[in-house]
């Protein structure tokens, strides 16, 4: 399904270039280091929430979306950890993405979903801004990062999570009367151009 296609795309997009120069120097900068260090815990929390959705979701469509999130973000996590290790071994100092924690969507605790009365709406309310934060982080990487693999991943994050935001907003209108994902910017739902 979509999860398999997205996973195949991620594997294909993340393979190939080793981002080393002719002397074996790592082609990365402080933005790349900041991106990996911020995106790893960001993805970990999304994976935790999606994993919880597999057992708590009331609607099969949300469970399917959560399964897709798990597949794609688990693959991305493996790549992020590998690239982070290479960047750290190269001694590249961490820069700054230029985003606040709120802008990165990191103020959400998946543990809060465990006891949510209306799980599906609570999941949507948490994950839409969380995904918007991932898109902002990916755009910051594209703007200033130089690591080719991370730049490809950022493009994929923008596309995949933009799609997922649109799906969750549709679910929100159907199941939550538009209250769960309301007030969030459409411009953060994927590519703007």
Model-based region annotation:
Residues 10-13:
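C-terminal motif of bacterial Sec signal peptides marking the signal peptidase cleavage site
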């Amino acid at each position: 399904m979509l999860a398999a296609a997205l996973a195949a795309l991620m594997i294909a997009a993340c393979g190939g270039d080793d981002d080393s120069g002719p002397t074996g120097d790592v082609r990365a900068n402080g933005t790349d280091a900041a991106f990996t260090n911020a995106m790893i815990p960001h993805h970990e929390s999304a994976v935790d929430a999606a994993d919880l959705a597999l057992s708590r979701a009331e609607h099969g469509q949300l469970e399917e979306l959560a399964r897709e999130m798990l597949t794609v973000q688990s693959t991305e996590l493996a790549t992020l950890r590998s690239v982070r290790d290479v960047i750290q071994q190269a001694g590249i100092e961490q820069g700054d993405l230029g985003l606040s924690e709120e802008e990165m969507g990191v103020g959400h605790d998946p543990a809060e979903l465990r006891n949510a009365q209306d799980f599906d709406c609570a999941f949507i309310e948490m994950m839409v801004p969380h995904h918007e934060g991932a898109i902002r982080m990916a755009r910051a990487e594209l703007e200033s990062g130089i690591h080719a693999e991370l730049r490809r991943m950022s493009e994929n994050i923008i596309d995949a999570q933009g799609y997922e935001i649109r799906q969750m907003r549709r679910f929100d209108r159907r199941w939550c009367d538009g209250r769960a994902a309301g007030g969030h910017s459409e411009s953060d739902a994927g590519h703007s151009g």
